């Protein structure tokens, strides 16, 4: 797709300009070129989100909004998990402060004094946490850049975000304890140090929501890894192993700058290089290509005698293309090179044109048909199996192949693995002969296919890291709540031991409540995770089945880590000496 830069005068109505561009129009004289084109104007600040740039070399960077939405969603879930954890632990800490606030009110402290104390404590706590967070960011910056194969730089937004957290978070966390203790009588504040049933339920609800979010992140992370594994290990429908893509023409391709003499000279060099590579004794097959197999080809509208039209990827290839990539014919026979025009379609293109059988299949370029209604249609001589040129989730592209010996600036070479050193030496000799250098610009097809999923690897890695952080944060919250909860029940545990309760009975008593919270959280998170995964993959042509496995693994993983966090506290409580506890109470 052609891209040009324009600068408009202030006040130009760009919406009106884009409405004009939607109307198809001729670019060339319609007597010999009946193709019609549309255009649109994209603001420079928005061009990053337009994915068409992925199919061509460009000076602009590009990205996907879907990836931004995913990362934003994961960050939001992790933030909510941490926020709930903070609220839960802070409320537990406030239970111990009730007596202190009550006594201060008795000795004359007013509401302003209480608010300043609470706000100062939260401000210092937030500042300390923010300092630790920035320290972690600095320490992990290099490994994170390597892990995600990118470079993160600081922006003014980071500073404003830190200032916002430093100012707003202490205010948010100070509101509840301030109203609770400033508007209650000193006697109520002193008595609130207890651990009532209402407090237990509210904290368990917070913990349950926190674990539901953790399960949600963990399940999504497991599915993303499952989907990535499927894409990396699914056969794309063509051979990728031991195939090299070599660029061998370095002359300018700007025909406006070439004289006729220079053009003929460059063509002669190109033919000579292609012939040299074609006769290489270390190559199984060679195929000169203009469009790489991992990228979309030139799109052309074709029509059938019945008037069915479809936009197809048009590739000019030789018969060796199908041999090199091991693309089999479902119907028909692969033609040989001759002076006739032969067309081959893949199964997806046949469906797009509503063609069922090879016998009735014939097409013509819509451009030629509009120019001459009596033009002859070309028969489809074979149907090739579908293959995935790009991202697996997008499915197979509707492709039509015109069989032609077409020279280009690069060549695919299929070789035997043990012959690679000899092949490279041969190519170096060719480059030395024509360009005076042994530098060979080449890539392996396997690496290019894997590179298609680089962004998916990053997303899966981020999900894994965030899921781990969510589990750790939830376990810290569980640790804080259980530490206070179990300590408050020491007297109950001592009495039960005196009355004959065994270790098994005590373990069941103390584990039961937390297992119930985990179970309810899992039940709540499961349908939500299923819905989010189903919605995200709704347009995927190839997608991993959701399956029960990811839910079971998430449950077992989170439960083992969480129960391990509880175990040492419960074991310590179960082994207490009843006499010691009764004396201290």
PLM segments and residue spans:
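Intracellular coupling helices
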Residues: 84-125, 183-193, 476-516, 575-584
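Hydrophobic alpha-helical transmembrane segments of multi-pass inner-membrane transport and secretion
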Residues: 62-99, 127, 202-227, 457-491, ...
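Short beta-strand boundary microenvironments
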Residues: 1, 256, 261, 269-360, ...
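"Rare, low-scoring activations can occur
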Residues: 1-61, 268, 274-281, 347-351, ...
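Membrane-helix entry/capping segments
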Residues: 25-75, 96, 140-161, 195-205, ...
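Alpha-helical transmembrane segments
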Residues: 140-148, 213-242, 536-541
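Membrane-proximal extracellular/periplasmic loop immediately following the first transmembrane helix
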Residues: 3-9, 18-23, 36, 40-50, ...
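Small-residue-rich transmembrane alpha-helices
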Residues: 40, 88, 122-186, 226, ...
């Amino acid at each position: 797709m052609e891209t040009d830069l324009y600068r408009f005068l202030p006040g130009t109505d760009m919406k009106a300009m884009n409405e004009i561009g939607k109307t198809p129009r001729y670019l060339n004289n319609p007597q010999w070129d009946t193709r019609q084109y549309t255009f649109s104007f994209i603001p420079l600040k928005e061009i990053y989100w337009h994915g068409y740039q992925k199919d061509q070399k460009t000076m602009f960077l590009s990205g996907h909004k879907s990836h931004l939405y995913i990362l934003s969603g994961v960050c939001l879930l992790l933030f909510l998990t941490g926020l709930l954890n903070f609220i839960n632990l802070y409320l537990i800490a406030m239970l111990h402060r009730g007596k202190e606030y009550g006594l201060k009110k008795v000795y004359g402290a007013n509401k302003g004094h209480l608010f300043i104390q609470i706000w100062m404590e939260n401000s210092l706590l937030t500042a300390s946490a923010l300092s630790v967070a920035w320290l972690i960011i600095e320490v992990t910056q290099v490994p994170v850049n390597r892990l995600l194969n990118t470079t993160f730089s600081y922006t003014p937004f980071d500073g404003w975000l830190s200032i916002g957290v430093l100012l707003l978070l202490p205010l948010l966390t100070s509101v509840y304890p301030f109203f609770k203790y400033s508007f209650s009588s000193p006697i109520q504040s002193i008595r609130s140090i207890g651990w009532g049933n209402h407090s237990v339920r509210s904290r368990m609800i917070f913990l349950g929501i926190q674990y539901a979010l953790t399960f949600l992140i963990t399940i999504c992370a497991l599915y993303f890894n499952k989907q990535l594994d499927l894409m990396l290990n699914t056969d794309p429908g063509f051979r990728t192993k031991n195939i090299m893509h070599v660029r061998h023409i370095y002359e300018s391709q700007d025909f406006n700058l070439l004289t006729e003499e220079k053009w003929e000279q460059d063509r002669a060099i190109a033919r000579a290089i292609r012939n040299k590579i074609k006769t290489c004794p270390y190559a199984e097959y060679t195929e000169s290509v203009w469009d790489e197999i991992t990228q979309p080809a030139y799109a052309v509208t074709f029509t059938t005698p019945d008037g069915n039209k479809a936009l197809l990827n048009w590739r000019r290839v030789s018969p060796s293309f199908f041999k090199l990539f091991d693309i089999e014919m479902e119907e028909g026979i692969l033609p040989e090179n001759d002076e006739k025009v032969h067309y081959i379609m893949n199964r997806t293109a046949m469906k797009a044109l509503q063609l069922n059988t090879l016998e009735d299949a014939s097409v013509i370029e819509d451009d030629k048909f509009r120019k001459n209604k009596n033009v002859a249609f070309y028969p489809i001589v074979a149907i090739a199996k579908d293959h995935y040129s790009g991202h697996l989730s997008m499915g197979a592209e509707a492709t039509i192949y015109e069989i032609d010996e077409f020279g280009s600036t690069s060549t695919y070479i299929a070789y035997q693995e043990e012959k690679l050193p000899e092949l490279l030496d041969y190519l170096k000799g060719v480059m030395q002969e024509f360009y005076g250098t042994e530098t060979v610009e080449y890539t392996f097809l396997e690496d290019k296919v894997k590179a298609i999923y680089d962004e998916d690897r990053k997303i899966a890695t981020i999900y894994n890291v965030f899921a781990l952080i969510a589990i750790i944060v939830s376990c810290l919250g569980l640790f804080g709540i259980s530490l206070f909860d179990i300590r408050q029940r020491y007297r109950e545990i001592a009495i039960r031991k005196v009355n004959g309760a065994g270790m098994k009975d005590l373990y069941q008593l103390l584990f039961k409540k937390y297992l119930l919270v985990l179970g309810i959280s899992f039940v709540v998170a499961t349908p939500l995770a299923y819905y989010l995964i189903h919605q995200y993959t709704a347009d995927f042509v190839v997608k991993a089945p959701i399956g029960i496995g990811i839910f079971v693994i998430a449950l077992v993983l989170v439960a083992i880590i969480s129960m391990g966090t509880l175990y040492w506290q419960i074991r310590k409580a179960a082994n207490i000496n009843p006499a010691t506890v009764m004396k201290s109470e």
